[in-house]
Amino acid sequence: MYNHNLIEKKWAKIWNDQKIYSFQIDKNKPKYYILDMFPYPSGKGLHVGHVKAYMATDVISRWKNALGFNVLHPIGWDAFGLPAEQYAIQTNNHPAKFTQENINNFRTQLKRLGFNYDYRLEVDTTNKNYFKWTQWIFKKLYEHDLAYQADIEVNWCEQLGTVLANEEVLTDENGNKISERGSYPVIKKKMRQWVLKITAFADQLIDDLENLNWPNSIKAMQVNWINKSVGASIKFEIDQLDNQTIEVFSSRADTLFGASFLALSFDHPLVKQKLITDKNNAIEQFIKDNSIDQRVRYQGINTNYFAIHPITKKKIPIYLADYILSDYGTGAVMGVPAHDERDYQFAKQYDLEIIPVIKADQYPYLLDGEHINSEFNNGLNNEQAIQKTIAYLREHNLGDQKINYKLRDWIFSRQRYWGEPFPVLFDEEDNIYLLKDSELPVELPQLSDFSPNKDGLPPLANADDQWLHPIIDQKKYRREINTMPQWAGSCWYYLAYLLKLTDLNQADGDQNYLALNSEKAKELFDHFMPVDLYVGGQEHAVLHLLYARFWYKFLHHIKIVSSTEPFSQLINQGMILGEDNTKMSKSKGNIINPDDLVLSHGADTIRTYVMFMGPLNASLAWNSNALNGTRKFLERVYNLFDRVEINDSINQNLNYDYHNFLKKINKHLENFEFNLVVSEMMIFINACYKQTQVNKEMITNFLIVLSFFAPYLAEELNSKLNNPTLLYKMRLAQWDEAYLVKNTTTISCSINGKFKLVHEFDLDSDEQEVANYFLNQDLIKRNLENKKLVKTIFVKNKVINFIIK
């Protein structure tokens, strides 16, 4: 009887005692670096939806190992961030304490499921030896002018008590801005922040996507997020203000002749410098009323100032408008209502002139066409008119071609406690000083209260004076009291695993790292990077995946790494939904706990079922009946050993099935078609059940494949074969094409074109042999009774058709 609990407990101990998953560098083998997006260790533990990606990488890593690769497949913990801190505040516990408890629980769960991780390589972003190097990278960014402080308008979430990056803000169905985490209201607020100049790498971040084997949807999301626009910078003089101009960016310079107004964002420099200082109370009140509400209503106010059209010299009104973004372009837009939907809505609202400059039947018209009302552009198409307009602007010093990006520099400060401290000091004049490498890491001080301040003052402001105001060389300094965002540690963790490869004697969970900037580290990076396969959710497309690429490109720039991209291939797994076909959540009560299933069905059943559910990238509902069906398949494999004799003799009847099995599973694994691999295992086992004896080598190689999915059961059956080597140490045999050339063919028999029978014949059997066989079958005989056979139609190796009357 297949007792999964006894089998899994037995082999877990043997594997642990023999340390079969302990990684060793072997440069005589090709390397294969495969990685999961490391998890945040929440207090809830893992549910089956979390582990789908881990199961996929486990299967691939075992397969690559069986093919002779030197496979690196580590795991770690992304443990800083808001969730831990929120939980700490709610329970009045320190986040460090329960974070470690959660990590221990996650590790135990992963071990139960039989993953082949070497836990000596485990990384923890909250460990001081780890974030020392996060701080070191920040220092290098600052030294290369890629980190700076600025007073900028930020996304402020009062409930979370922190600033959020643009990538962390969503828009709800009512047009309100909300936080990605918790769906709390987000408003705009001006604060002094640390910012990383990700825009310096914008072109590389777009151009290098072409070389990556990533889903096209993820590439498109990153391209659209960066949103490179080639357009024109155009200068408009202000009628009432001498020597003052408003610069606008437009990707449609060809529509300049259709500009009938200018629209400014609420915090455009001229709003602060001139319009507000004119003591226009209506404008002040308008800004106050509309700054809180983030929704676009196409509301505006006339400033009573006019701009002078750079070509026609016509005066056009200047408005403030709620649809103008301060952080895109210049914060000023030339309104062309006839050829822009937003400008059209605004112009209709305020009865502004609509000037068509492209011939069309209906406006607003946004496509290509013949230009009209445009002086030297009349008769030209869009591209021709754009180039001619830019040339005119350049010649008359009124503007020039310009490249613009939607991507903003990354706001890198968080007003929270549970994050990496900045390696920065300020003197009494607010001059910035970086700590020396020897002074890293900067550790978090112990606080009794780390609740966020709703006014934006970070919890670290409550630290003791010794931490907050260190004295160095008899000079008093002030520490930075913001912390880094939760994304910081995950920007480089794929390198951190490699920094542990030179100290493989450390125990599970120890955190000793080689220096990131050492020659030995460079040697390891050159050998193992980039990651060959990265698996994780598509929700990280413009967050972690973009940030990690940015940091890696910077590390390439300063010659820490040689390659330009961290992840060669990316796969996004789909979700496992609850049995009610909705996303698993505690509130819905549809979470499937793997710990319960390990006890009731076994880890092997869970692993095999999850991989058998369907395509990896599909989101599919959990089905308990299908889980039970997978369990029955594993029982069928187990029982085979009592049904057939397994020996060293060659069973010619299985040659085709065996070699076809090996060929197909390799093809399916190359394409990450795990469900089809399980199907092929079922087909091969069915073929084995038709035999009285099966070759031991064939069964051993089947067990190697089974071990990718059900390692415990496979190892138990391998021991029954008395094989001296554990499956994880074996190599998978290659198929032989010679056995895949079939010497037989299936021929169907029809009567008057209606199908009756099929039978297997030797290849190229002649008509007489085939006809004699079918004419002697009872079914055919009955159909021919009292009938006359008038004709036989025979197509060699395919079909025979008897025509009767």
UniProtKB/Swiss-Prot annotation:
Gene3D superfamilies: 3.10.20.590, HUPs (3.40.50.620), Isoleucyl-tRNA Synthetase, Domain 1 (1.10.730.10). A motif ('KMSKS' region) lies at residues 583-587. GO terms for cellular component: cytosol. It comes from Mycoplasmoides gallisepticum (strain R(low / passage 15 / clone 2)). It is found in: Cytoplasm. Keywords: Aminoacyl-tRNA synthetase, ATP-binding, Cytoplasm, Ligase, Nucleotide-binding, Protein biosynthesis. ATP binds at residue 586. Its EC number is 6.1.1.4. InterPro entries: aa-tRNA-synth_I_CS, aa-tRNA-synth_Ia, Leu-tRNA-ligase, Leu_tRNA-synth_edit, M/V/L/I-tRNA-synth_anticd-bd, Methionyl/Leucyl_tRNA_Synth, Rossmann-like_a/b/a_fold, tRNAsynth_Ia_anticodon-bd. One of its GO terms (biological process) is leucyl-tRNA aminoacylation. CDD domains: LeuRS_core. The gene is leuS. This is Leucine--tRNA ligase. PANTHER family: LEUCINE--TRNA LIGASE, MITOCHONDRIAL, LEUCYL-TRNA SYNTHETASE. It catalyses: tRNA(Leu) + L-leucine + ATP = L-leucyl-tRNA(Leu) + AMP + diphosphate. A motif ('HIGH' region) lies at residues 39-50. The keyword Repeat does not apply. The lineage of its organism: Bacteria, Bacillati, Mycoplasmatota, Mycoplasmoidales, Mycoplasmoidaceae. Belongs to the class-I aminoacyl-tRNA synthetase family. The keyword Ligase applies. HAMAP family: Leu_tRNA_synth_B (MF_00049_B). One of its GO terms (molecular function) is ATP binding.
